[in-house]
Amino acid sequence: MLTDLRLYQLISPSLPVGAFTYSQGLEWAIEKGWVKDEQSLALWLTSQMQGSLATLEIPILIQLHHLLGVQNYEKAQYWCDFIVASRETKELRIEERQRGAAFAKLLPQLGIDLSERTFPLVNQTQVAAFALAAEKWEIPLVKLCSAYMWSWLENAVMAGVKLIPLGQTAGQKLLIDLTKFVPEVIEKSMRWPCDRIGSFTPAQVIASCQHETQYTRLFRS
């Protein structure tokens, strides 16, 4: 039970890591009319779940969870470098590092000490932070992956609710609809070969590029 409570804390919107300040290109996509209602937002997020979460973030989270457990920091560093390199725009790379840096400050205050080997990993990407926290708090891997996806989905949907805008009830309905795909995505991630880890979300990359010079912005990405 305690591990579940620690997991809820790790994905809480109140966690002071600034997750709510990023839209990952969604803000520009909405301004240009690519995303304009509940249905188009669902399609936008589903494509990211299948083209990035299932084939990049979750597979690397799985790798890091194992590697940190066996203290293979050299290989863990490889995957941390890989995920940052896979962020195809400047603002997405900055976001990855900013989230990681926020966790690097937070985790020691939550009782997870960072060594000279683990600090550079967490400071680079929040994926390493999730993996390390799960290893220290003995959170099962499948629960960790589900929680990571929930955290991403909730932030993305709430950004859409604010920007389109949608009603709060519509946002909650969308979360129910999209979480139905989570088990499928995790199963796909568990089987995904290491030599195929990567993402293919060209629309998001274009939107993120354009967002970097968008005149009026609420979000940092």
Curated annotation (Swiss-Prot):
Please describe the quaternary structure of this protein: UreD, UreF and UreG form a complex that acts as a GTP-hydrolysis-dependent molecular chaperone, activating the urease apoprotein by helping to assemble the nickel containing metallocenter of UreC. The UreE protein probably delivers the nickel.
Q: What is its main location?
A: cytoplasm
Query: What highest taxon heads this organism's lineage?
Result: Bacteria
Record keywords, A-Z:
Chaperone, Cytoplasm, Nickel insertion
Q: Which gene encodes it?
A: ureF
Stated name of the protein: Urease accessory protein UreF
Q: Is Acyltransferase given among the entry's keywords? A: no
> Which family does the record claim for this protein?
Belongs to the UreF family.
| Residue ranges the record marks as coiled coil | none
Q: Which PANTHER family match?
A: UREASE ACCESSORY PROTEIN F
Q: Which organism is it from?
A: Vibrio parahaemolyticus
What InterPro entries would the database entry show?
UreF (IPR002639), UreF_sf (IPR038277)
Purpose = Required for maturation of urease via the functional incorporation of the urease nickel metallocenter.
Stored HAMAP family: UreF (MF_01385)
Show the GO cellular component annotation of the record. cytoplasm
What is a single molecular function from GO for this protein? nickel cation binding
Q: Where in the cell is it found?
A: Cytoplasm
